[in-house]
From Swiss-Prot:
It comes from Escherichia coli O9:H4 (strain HS). Belongs to the UPF0056 (MarC) family. This is UPF0056 inner membrane protein MarC. Keywords: Cell inner membrane, Cell membrane, Membrane, Transmembrane, Transmembrane helix. GO terms for cellular component: plasma membrane. The chain crosses the membrane at residues 8-28, 45-65, 69-89, 119-139, 155-175, 197-217. Its main location: membrane. It is found in: Cell inner membrane. It is a multi-pass membrane protein. It holds the Pfam family MarC. Disulfide bonds: none annotated. The keyword Acetylation does not apply. Signal peptide: none annotated. It comes from the Bacteria.
Amino acid sequence: MLDLFKAIGLGLVVLLPLANPLTTVALFLGLAGNMNSAERNRQSLMASVYVFAIMMVAYYAGQLVMDTFGISIPGLRIAGGLIVAFIGFRMLFPQQKAIDSPEAKSKSEELEDEPSAHIAFVPLAMPSTAGPGTIAMIISSASTVRQSSTFADWVLMVAPPLIFFLVAVILWGSLRSSGAIMRLVGKGGIEAISRLMGFLLVCMGVQFIINGILEIIKTYH
């Protein structure tokens, strides 16, 4: 049971900086201004469900995609590392606010014409929370843990759905209490946390690339 808690904790530490619910909160506040409370709550719940579904598909179908297209694990690690590092650099040195992103702009225009427009899948679930970096990390981690003997088989079977469920619950709670979070942390606080998470992502991305290169050297040496 202790191994299960360790696996869940490790999964959350890896995924939460990538998912970064606080930036999704800022985006949600910008897009949901014209919605009533019931509609905001519904969009929050749907976004969380979509995030859970995307992560589950990435974890369980990722290996099939790799086999179909002939993608090796070192190649995936290097590609995933580049994506994660790029996202980290963008969080460290943001060029545009979340509300100014193309996805947010198109949704803002929809909301002006249609108050009940859906923002749960795009941009809240994808790409804000479960974006390319998150998906690459999940697929790469799935390939890695299946080859490792760190955790028992039952832990590797039970932990991933629980990790994805907890990420979805954290996102749901953050979106439901978005107003309170923004008042408590403030815009500057969210930016500071985003930059800190960006630095962590750059470090994780570089380590991914190093691991991929070392595995290539070990394979072909």
